[in-house]
C-alpha cells in the first residue's frame, strides 16, 4: 500500500538555487526508507515538501492517494500524519521545559488537557526521558535533545516519521539508541523515512533506498540492488558500504560462496567457505591414509558449528613433518541468545536466569532496560550493537541474555531467528520469561520430548 507519493516534484529557492527536479517516488506503508546523497543533493528540501512546510512549484504530493492541500486546516492534518525531526534539534526545541516542548504539537492540534498529558507521558516514557520532563532542553546532551524532538513528533501519533540526518553529531552509543527507537516505531507500524550520507547505515538498516545527486533522483531499489552499482555510487559521490566491500573482496579471492549481499558482520562471516583441507603437524610414524583425532576447533576454524570435534584423514606428508589432511567435522555444544522482557521485570528472576543458565554475556537495549539494569547492579557487557554482538558470542558457544522491552523484544527475537534460519547454524533463541520459556539445545538433545525454541 502506497502511503506517500510524489509526481514530477520541482522546487527552486527564491535566490535561484534549484533544489529538486522532477522527483517521482512511492513510499510503501510500514517500510524503512533511506534517502542517500551528499550534502546539497536535495534531501532536506524534499523532506520539507513531504511535511507541507514548503509548497512545490511544480508537481504534486499525495498522502493515501489524495493530493496535498495547503489551507491551514489541511496542513494541520498533514503535519499530524507526517511528522518531521530536523537535523539540528535546536531548530525544533524552544519551550522552557522538556514537557512543554513535547506538548506543543498536541496542544496545537486542539487535544484536551487530559489527552495532551497522556500523549506526552507516553512519548517521554517511550524515549526514556520521563525523569527529565521538567528540565530546560538547552541543558540536555545532543542525544537527549534528539530524543526530545522525536518525542514531540511521536506525541502527535503520526503514520510517517521523517528524520533529516538523525545521527548527526551523536556519539556511537547515542546513535545506537536513536536507531533502536526508530526500529521500535517501525515494529509498531510507523513508516520511517531518513536522509543520510552514511552508506553503511542506509545499507544495513533500510528496506528501500533512494539515491539523490544534484537535485535529482538517480537510482532506487533495495539496498542490495542500489549499492552494488559502482558507477551509480560514483556519480552520487558515494562509496560502497564497508560490509559489502569486504564481501566482494573475499569473494574475488575465492573465500566466499554463494551470491550474497551480507548486511551485518554475522551475515558476512557466514559467507566464508568452510575449510576442507588443512596443514597440521603429525606425530612421527603416521602414514598417509591414516586417521587422526585433531581435537576441538572453534572461532575462525569452526565453519559449521560454534565448536567442532575434528577427525582427519592424512592425504600427504611433507618432509618437514607437516601433513595435508582432509577434515571431518562434528558440531558440539552451541551457545544461544535468550531475551528477557523487561516489561515483566523481576531482579531476583533475572539473577536466577543468569545463574541457572550459566549466562556469560549480558546486553541491554532501550533506555528503560539499561536504566533498570544499572540501578540494580546488573553487569552489562554490551549496550550498543547488542543483537549482532550477542549472535557472534553465541556462535562461539557463549550463552547470552538480552534485556529489552516493548516491541524491541520481538524485533530482537525475529532478527536472531532470521540469522539462524539463513545461516543454518543452530543455537538456542527464545524469550525466557514468556509462557513456555525455552531450553538450551543440548538439553533438548538429551530429552527429545522437550519443547525446542
From Swiss-Prot:
| Top-level lineage group | Archaea
Gene3D superfamilies hit by this protein: P-loop containing nucleotide triphosphate hydrolases
For ATP, which residues are the binding ones?
37-44
Q: Which SMART domains match?
A: AAA
Write out the GO biological process terms.
cobalt ion transport
Q: What does this protein do?
A: Probably part of an ABC transporter complex. Responsible for energy coupling to the transport system.
- Protein known as: Putative ABC transporter ATP-binding protein MA_3551
Query: From which source organism is this entry?
Result: Methanosarcina acetivorans (strain ATCC 35395 / DSM 2834 / JCM 12185 / C2A)
